[in-house]
Amino acid sequence: IPLIKKIINNKNNQVIITFFSPSGYENFKYNNNQIFKTYIPLDFNKNAKDFLYIINPKHAIFVKYDLWMNFIEICHKNKIPTTVFSGKFHNKQWYFKFYGQWAKNILKNLTNIFTIDKASNDFLRSEGFQNVTFNGDTRYDQVNTNLINSSLKIKSPCLILGSSWVKEEKILSNVIDKFPDIQYIIAPHEVNKKRLNELQIIFGSKSKFYSQIDFSKEIPNILIIDKIGLLSDLYSLSDIAFVGGGFTGKLHNIIEPAAKGNKIIFGPNHKKFPEAQLMIDNEIALTIKDEFDLMEILKSIKRSNTNRKKSIEFVLNKKGATEIVYKAIMNKN
C-alpha cells in the first residue's frame, strides 16, 4: 500500500494490481480511479504473453515470493522493466537447486531486486546476482507511530492478545488469575459466533465483550473485542502485545504493535518472519513456548516510557524502504 500511494500521487500514473486467489481479490478495497484490480492467469508462456500484451505495463512489480517466471521472462524480452521488493532468498528455495537453474537465470534478468534482509542480499550476490539492493521492509512505512486517545478507561499495565488463536488464548487464560493487577484485552484473529463462544468458555465469567461495556465506567479486567477494525488503535493503550500465530508458523503483524511502543511477545515458530528476529535482537520482543515463559515475563511487567520509546524508535529507524523502491521504479520508466 505505501508504494501504491506514492505511485498514484502522480495523477498520470495508473496501477493494475493482480491477484491469484479470490480471497485476496475480494478483500482488496481501495476507492481510487487510478487503481484497477484483476486476476492474474496461470504462469504459462502464452498466458503471460497475452496478459502483458493487453495491459502493456510500463513497469512490472513483484512482491516477496510471488515470482512468476514466464511473466518475468516475457517482460525481459519485451524490454519491460521489472522490480521485486521485500524479497527473501535462501539456498533452500527451488530456483537455487540444480533443477531450478533455468529459473535462477530468469531471475538474474530482473531490473531490480530489493531484499527484506541483509542475509538475502548477501546470498544473492554469492550466487552471482548484480541487480540486488538491501533496503528493508516496506511494511514499516505503512504503520503510524502516533498514539491515540481513547474513551476506554484502561488500567495500567495492560496486555493485549492481538490476532489470537486458541493456542495463545489458552496459554494466557492459565496465568491470568496469578496476575490480577494487569488489564487484559483479547482481540481474536477471527470474530464470529463460534470463536466468541470459545473465548467465553476459555476466559470465563470474569470476561466481558466490548459491545457490552459502559464507556463511562472502568472496563472489566478481561475485555474481549467482538468488533473488527479496532486492533491498531488498541495497541496505543497496551504495554505488552502478545501476538498470535507464533505457534503455527503464521505470525501476525508485529510491526504495528511495535510502532505503538509495545513490548512484543510471540510463539517460537517465527523463522519465516525476519522482523521477528530483528525485534528479539533489539530487545523489544520476546519469544515464549508455554505459560511458564509467559509468567516470567508478567512478573516483571511495568509501564515504562523508556521501553515504549525504544519500540517506537526501532520502527522509525526502519522506515524509508518504500522511497528507495519508488525512486528505482521511476528512474526506469
Which residues does each PLM region occupy?
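Nucleotide-activated sugar donor-binding and catalytic core shared by glycosyltransferases
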Residues: 1-333
